UniProtKB/Swiss-Prot annotation:
Gene source species: Klebsiella pneumoniae (strain 342)
GO molecular function term, any single one: nucleotide binding
Alphabetic keyword roster: Cytoplasm, Hydrolase, Metal-binding, Nucleotide-binding
Family, as annotated: Belongs to the SurE nucleotidase family.
Name by which UniProt lists this protein: 5'/3'-nucleotidase SurE
Primary residence: cytoplasm
UniProt-annotated binding residues for a divalent metal cation: D8, D9, S39, N92
Length: 253
């Protein structure tokens, strides 16, 4: 199995280093990751400037100022030959649950892999300690995928409780919950008296009931949420069509 491995915490982050070491026990791994923390970069792609890469002695490649999406795009289209069998993103420091997937660079890297035609996993740890647990879970899932590929064009968003491996209760397939909208902005003054703003933490859980990714992780289970790239709200087609006909917008400009 050939794996393109990226993340959004940066190439030196403990999550990606732990996962790369574990994956190399049974797979060919090419790391292509940002040279610094790009958390919250979502699906941003660098278009107005060039991208420079640096290759370490072990073959890992850092993309200077690159986003997670940049890294996967370059990895698939230029840096990994032959191309990968699968794209893996993580292990993220902290969860990507519910609305987090909108902003997450970890999920975005996997989404770019899927967009380019490859199976993709995004892996996050609900904390900052037991990266070895998340790595073991990821390796188990990847070994299973190598034996029997998943017949669905979906991204698997995997969130792992921050627990020792022997305390993980199992795996649940979940849906995304959601949070209350975040509204905290923290102002500060720089030495010249200008105002700086920091975006505050995410909102509290709102929909975290049974079946959600929040609930699974809180109860000690690995959460696996299938995601897809198509953002079309297919069930809303008829509602929107009826509304447009009713209000008479068509042809009124």
């Amino acid at each position: 199995m050939r794996i393109l491995l990226s993340n959004d915490d940066g190439i030196h982050a403990p999550g990606i280093q732990t996962l790369a070491k574990a994956l190399r026990e049974f797979a060919e791994v090419q790391v292509v990751a940002p040279d610094r923390n790009r958390s919250g970069a979502s699906n941003s792609l660098t278009l107005e400037s060039s991208l420079r890469t640096f290759t370490f002695e072990n073959g890992d490649i850092a993309v200077q100022m690159g986003t997670p999406t940049d890294c996967v795009y370059l990895g698939v289209n230029a840096l990994m030959r032959p191309r990968p069998d699968i794209v893996v993103s993580g292990i993220n420091a902290g969860p990507n649950l519910g609305d987090d997937v909108i902003y997450s660079g970890t999920v975005a890297a996997a989404m770019e892999g899927r967009h380019l035609g490859f199976p993709a996993l995004a892996v996050s740890l609900n904390g900052y300690q037991h990266y070895d647990t998340a790595a073991a879970v990821t390796c188990t899932i990847l070994r299973a995928l190598s034996r029997e590929p998943l017949r669905t064009g979906r991204i698997l968003n995997i969130n792992v409780p921050d627990l020792p491996l022997d305390q993980i209760k199992g795996i649940r397939v979940t849906r995304c919950g959601n949070r209350h909208p975040a509204d905290q902005v923290i102002p500060q003054k720089d030495p010249r008296g200008n105002t700086l703003y920091w975006i505050g933490p995410p909102g509290d859980k709102r929909d975290a009931g049974p079946g959600t990714d929040f609930a699974a992780v809180d109860e000690g289970y690995v959460s696996v949420t299938p995601l897809h790239v198509d953002l079309t709200a297919h069930q809303a087609h008829e509602v929107v069509s009826d509304w447009l006909e009713r209000v008479g917008v068509d042809g009124q400009w």
